[in-house]
Amino acid sequence: SAASEVYKRQLGIESIPSESECYPAKLAHGHISWLLNQGVSYIFYPCVPYERKEFDEAGNHYNCPIVTSYGENIKNNVEELADESITYQNPFVSFESDKILADELVRYLGKENNIDAGEIRKAAHKAYEELQKTRNDIRLEGERVLKWMADNNKRGIVLAGRPYHIDPEINHGIPELITSYDIAVLSEDSISHLGKVDRPTIAMDQWMYHSRLYAAASFVRTQN
């Protein structure tokens, strides 16, 4: 894969500030270096502290610290970005709602890039519609798999890790290994809408994907 090639070639490795960072964070350095090597002169890498609040009762809805601020890390560690011929933009924006996202993008892109406010709002709304459509498709597929399991007396496993574990570059083929034994594999976001979490929880579900994990686990415990 492209990500694997970036990693194997060790692109951007000199700008990674800590070995303890997650694999996607390390890849980000390589991708930025790859873009610069291709002569790209404009890079937009926003920081996204808040995710959509998928559960009203959730304690919070942050993204993880990497997603929240990694654009800043890149800016401060990739020396090539100091070149005046490179435009690098990393505003902080929130995905809490399409209106909040659009308002923040209008303030930033309207001022910095002179993009029409109406065009920005339309794009943000369309993006949110597509995001919801994709989420719905994932949930419908989860329900389809659950029905298949019930109809055929099959078992399934919920692979409930971090969001990026869905990437074949990272998960080492574990989903395919499981399905080769005729066991269904579900992601946490394919069934989280079916769960009901007993609240208050012992831990604050600070990040949105934690809320999905708790909801998915709550559903799993109701199944035979």
Give, region by region, the residue ranges found by the protein language model.
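N-terminal beta-loop-helix "entrance" segment that forms/cooperates
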Residues: 8-25, 194-208
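Short acidic, glycine/serine/threonine-rich loops at helix termini
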Residues: 10-16, 53-62, 99-105, 169-172, ...
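A charged, amphipathic alpha-helical module
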Residues: 92-192
